[in-house]
Amino acid sequence: MDSQVRQNYHRDCEAAVNRMINMELFASYSYTSMAFYFSRDDVALPGFAHFFKENSDEEREHADKLLTFQNSRGGRIFLQDIKKPERDEWGSGLDALQSSLQLEKNVNQALLDLHKIASDHTDPHMCDFLETHYLNEQVESIKKLGDFITNLSRMDAVKNKMAEYLFDKHTMGGKN
């Protein structure tokens, strides 16, 4: 049955929103993997665990917003399989942050592509929705991750585990 509320909502936009929902859920799934890796007894970096758990929750909220948007525009939700994260072992905090940065850049590019599709189909509602709820937040997340990576690299945290521990405790808010 067709939606009664659908107006100026192109099928390409609808399909792209469904793909974006999947990408946000994949990001949440990846961050969940990172969070529980860092809370293992042999890794024990609670600040990193907390940071990645918060990121997982945030990505899930992004997916929920897109699901709500899809319904409000009269689109249909077609969930897809969520891909497994690229790995199960995340290495050091620096390694995980570098993976996180790449993930956020991929999400950002997908959002920019989604915005272009909306713009090409003259959908000001979708453009406004993406600009209001996603685009600036992505840039801020990428900047924050870049700053964390710079500081951990500056402290030579790969070789200096005390630096990683202190970064976890003081920057990431880890508590024993």
Curated annotation (Swiss-Prot):
Binding of Fe cation 1: at which residues? Answer: E24, E59, H62
What does the tissue specificity note say?
A: Liver (at protein level).
Q: Which residues bind Fe cation 2?
A: E59, E104, Q138
Q: Which reaction does it catalyse?
A: 4 Fe(2+) + O2 + 4 H(+) = 4 Fe(3+) + 2 H2O
Where does the Ferritin-like diiron domain start and stop, copy by copy? 7-156
Which UniProt keywords are listed? Iron, Iron storage, Metal-binding, Oxidoreductase
Give a GO cellular-component term.
Answer: cytoplasm
- Enzyme Commission number(s) from the entry: 1.16.3.1
Database matches in InterPro entries: Ferritin (IPR001519), Ferritin-like (IPR012347), Ferritin-like_diiron (IPR009040), Ferritin-like_SF (IPR009078), Ferritin_CS (IPR014034), Ferritin_DPS_dom (IPR008331)
Write down a Pfam family by its short name: Ferritin
BP term (GO), one: intracellular iron ion homeostasis
Q: What top-tier enzyme class does this entry carry?
A: oxidoreductase
General function of this protein:
Stores iron in a soluble, non-toxic, readily available form. Important for iron homeostasis. Has ferroxidase activity. Iron is taken up in the ferrous form and deposited as ferric hydroxides after oxidation.
Quaternary context: In liver, forms a heteromer consisting of middle and heavy subunits. The functional molecule forms a roughly spherical shell with a diameter of 12 nm and contains a central cavity into which the insoluble mineral iron core is deposited.
Which family does this protein fall into?
Belongs to the ferritin family.
Q: What is this protein called?
A: Ferritin, liver middle subunit
Q: Which organism is it from?
A: Trematomus bernacchii (Emerald rockcod)
